[in-house]
């Protein structure tokens, strides 16, 4: 419930900035009769505006082959698209909140899994991989996003592009691995889960990060700092150059948007849908006697499955706006090119990247960037409210930073096989080694 409230509050703040942006845009874009009047040359933020620039360039190249009777392309924008100060302030404040919550939440989550032996298992290792990728993104990309609103450089945009796409790959592959792991756990219900990191899971985690690096090679090679001339000003932009030398890079340039949407967004959702459907069928096929005997055991696995499903839903909600905006820009450029080639002067979509509509595309793009950044800090918050075990660990870990925990020994039997650790009002069961150690000191 609290996760939903946080998500709604985040969207409300973004919508306030968007509404103010549109209001200011309508006031600052009157009917201009003299295009040569002096324009405001405020620097514009240029992160993830690559497809717009690239498609405009491709459009100008394609119109050169049209017959003389074809209509000329639409006139260029009278001013550079820019983000108003209200939207800058809102996004900067929200980026600072993401930075603080993400640093505390993800570092605490990694500490919990590292310190507690009972938390070192297969699914938690994959969750730790998600937290490590989010922490890596927060430390590098979030400061670049905040600073680039006020001072943008091409080199920082290049770093942001690589970190952003690499983190998206790690996240999507880890979610796929989590869905497969949950199905295997339910399908092999008679397998007792051991404490510790299995060798197979360590190899799987290494492959996830290695595959993410390999898939990142096209972007690392293709993305380059390109100098663009706009009304006498030289702009340094990180983008895919319009002229590629190899056939593979030209093909990648055409399918890039659909590749990112299919691999980074649809693949985790498809894996979750398929394996969770199989998992539901497997749980329904268990006999009643087996279900009663393994009631507690299956409850734990259902709780982990619910946690993974919650992470996938949050991933879908946070990344959908960014992919929708990228696809919209791509489709609008395609329709615009088709309208010009078919000699339709009054095509509505032909004006979609000029004037006020281009401002709307920028707002959509920045909303998608902020929502994708929100995904890097909301994972630990979701785990706190969904998983009872993670909630107890978060409370004990965060409280022990403020107060020294007190250890009270309560022997459960004469063998000393039980014990409790009371820290700040929370009772947590000790493992066997801690119980034997505490029983030794209590007997002495």
Swiss-Prot record:
Segments on the Extracellular side according to the record's topology features: 19-88, 146-161, 227-254, 329-365
GO molecular function terms listed in the Swiss-Prot or TrEMBL record: endothelin receptor activity
Cytoplasmic side, ranges: 114-124, 181-201, 280-307, 387-444
Gene Ontology biological process: developmental pigmentation; endothelin receptor signaling pathway; enteric nervous system development; regulation of blood pressure; vasoconstriction
Subcellular location: Cell membrane
Keywords: Cell membrane, G-protein coupled receptor, Glycoprotein, Membrane, Receptor, Signal, Transducer, Transmembrane, Transmembrane helix
GO cellular component term, pick one: plasma membrane
InterPro entries: Endthln_rcpt, GPCR_endothelin_rcpt, GPCR_Rhodpsn, GPCR_Rhodpsn_7TM
Region (Disordered): 416-444
Composition bias type Basic and acidic residues, residue spans: 424-434
Disulfide bond positions: none
Glycan-carrying positions: 60
Signal peptide extent: 1-18
One Pfam family this sequence matches: 7tm_1
Low complexity composition bias: residue spans: 435-444
Similarity comment text for this entry: Belongs to the G-protein coupled receptor 1 family. Endothelin receptor subfamily.
Summary of the function given for this chain in its UniProt record: Receptor for endothelin-3. Mediates its action by association with G proteins that activate a phosphatidylinositol-calcium second messenger system.
Protein name: Endothelin-3 receptor
